[in-house]
Each structure stands twice: as C-alpha cells, then as structure tokens.
C-alpha cells in the first residue's frame, strides 16, 4: 500500500505541543549533535556521519516526493520547532502484512522523559490511518524499556515476539488504526 503524494513543504502535523514535519537538510547538524549511544544502538545502527545523515535526509525527501513507502518526520517542539528527534513510518517492510505500518522513533537525550515521543506516535498513527494504514507496528528490542513504555502509552498492545533478519529478538506492539482517525 503506497501512501498518497503530499506537498513535502506543506506537510505538518501538530497537537499544539509537538509538530511533525518532513526531515530537511538543515536538520542534519541538530541530528548529529543529538545522537547518543541509545539512538545509535536502538535506531540508527551506528554512529552517523554528516555524509550519511545528509544522504538519508535526501532519500527521505525523495520518498516523500515520489509517494514511496517511507515517511520520515522530524519531531519538533516549541514555537521555533526545535528538532527533538525523529519518527519514521514504513508502509512496506520486513515482516509487515498488507495494511500494516511500521513506526520507529527516537528522541535526543535532552528531550526524553517529557511525553514527546508518545505525542509523536499518536500524531503519526493518525496520519498513517488517513493514508490507509490498518494497523501500526512498533518493534522493540526487549531491553529497550523506554520505547516499550512509549508504545503502551500510545495505545499499542503487546504482540508476538519475532526475530529480525539478523536474528535479533524483537517485541512487537500493535495498534488498530481505525480509532486513530478520531484522535
């Protein structure tokens, strides 16, 4: 299921506290500054370099413009929309059934513990539902208790444990997206 094409520059989701908008090249420095051991371990797969992060942001922009299966948002806070982290939706991917959408997120250290990731997940679930997603899936390594807590607070229920293609155990959390349209 491919999402519909949206104007990249105009895309914003907000609940009045958190604003989600597509990643852009001027986010690269803030992302590199905010990256820590937890983001590297659980989300990024390795420390970012300027070249790698710029290439990823360009890829994300191309996905938005081509209505591809990836939707990568910056999690922004405050009037100035300071970058606090990222959240990605994948409408296709490893071990996803038709209609399922993978949600992956991470906050920079100074923004953790404020409920921002939960708000971002709720916002992105509404967007995924509006794009035809039927069920959201969050895949978390068992020792990543913070991400599991975000999933539960955002209305996800524990699903079956799975193995990733590299053999890592992942706890799956799932949420029916029908109710997300009304949030």
Residue locations for each model-derived region?
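Residues lining the SAM
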Residues: 37, 139, 154
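Short amphipathic helical patch at the helix-1/turn junction of helix-turn-helix
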Residues: 107, 141-142
């Amino acid at each position: 299921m491919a999402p519909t094409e949206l104007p990249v520059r105009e895309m914003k989701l907000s609940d009045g506290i958190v604003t989600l908008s597509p990643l852009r090249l001027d986010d690269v420095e803030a992302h590199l500054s905010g990256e820590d051991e937890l983001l590297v371990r659980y989300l990024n797969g390795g420390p970012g370099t300027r070249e790698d992060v710029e290439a990823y942001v360009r890829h994300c922009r191309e996905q938005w413009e081509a209505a591809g299966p990836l939707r990568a948002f910056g999690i922004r806070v405050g009037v100035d929309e300071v970058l606090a982290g990222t959240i990605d939706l994948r409408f296709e991917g490893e071990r996803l059934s038709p209609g399922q959408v993978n949600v992956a997120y991470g906050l920079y250290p100074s923004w953790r513990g404020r409920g921002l990731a939960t708000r971002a997940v709720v916002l992105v679930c509404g967007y995924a539902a509006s794009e035809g997603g039927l069920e959201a899936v969050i895949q978390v390594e068992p020792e990543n208790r913070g991400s599991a807590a975000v999933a539960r607070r955002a209305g996800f229920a524990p699903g079956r444990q799975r193995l990733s293609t590299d053999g890592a155990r992942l706890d799956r959390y799932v949420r029916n997206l029908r109710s997300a349209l009304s949030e």
